[in-house]
A protein has these predicted regions:
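Soluble "head" domains of membrane/secretory-pathway proteins
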Residues: 2-11, 16, 23, 27, ...
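Aromatic-capped interface at the extracytoplasmic side
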Residues: 25-44
Length: 182
């Protein structure tokens, strides 16, 4: 009888720890870290088609963060934040300007072949010509893909709201040969 009670106690202890582990994993996945697949080549140079990234929902959005967001039509994208609320954004001769000040984009790998060296990597634009406004709105972010020539981003669908942002992409965990922080 004593050994049976010991076995039952151990069984319930294992069940209790398993439930705690599952609940913890569920809470982490639901509220902190979420796996997301990379689809398309608009972030080529930073992320590749088929990479799996983990996003987190806690950190505030900063310039050059790679974020995952959802548009009103339900489509999900992963892009880099270039412009923050209240800022003016423009590109002239492949140079990013925020509030008329030049900003370097050290992360950007310019995938140019020799025969396109004279071509612009990021076509010139400003918010006035794209959206008819000088500055981004109170909760608006301007996002753009690192592979500028092959990216559908804020240049085509406009700025995104902070509410649309699902989280910051923090690291690539698959494929195993590509594991790294973003």
């Amino acid at each position: 009888v004593a050994s049976k009670k010991l076995w039952v106690d151990r069984f319930w202890l294992v069940v209790k720890y398993a439930l705690i582990a599952f609940a913890t994993a569920f809470l982490i996945r639901a509220f902190l870290l979420i796996p997301v697949p990379v689809e398309g080549n608009s972030m080529e140079g930073t992320l590749k088609q088929g990479d799996m990234v983990v996003i987190e929902k806690i950190s505030p959005i900063q310039r050059f963060d790679v974020v995952v967001f959802q548009l009103p039509d339900g489509s999900t994208y992963i892009k880099r934040v270039i412009g923050l609320p209240g800022e003016s954004v423009k590109y002239v001769n492949d140079q990013l300007y925020i509030d008329d000040e030049p900003v370097d984009e050290d992360f950007l790998v310019k995938n140019r072949s020799n025969d396109h060296e004279s071509a612009s990597y990021t076509n010139d634009f400003d918010l006035e010509s794209l959206l008819g406004v000088e500055k981004l709105g109170k909760d608006s972010y301007f996002v753009i893909g690192d592979n500028r020539r092959a990216s559908k981003d804020s240049r085509s669908f406009g700025p995104i709201s902070g509410e649309a942002i699902l989280g910051n992409a923090r690291f690539v965990y698959y494929p195993l040969t590509h594991i790294r922080l973003i």
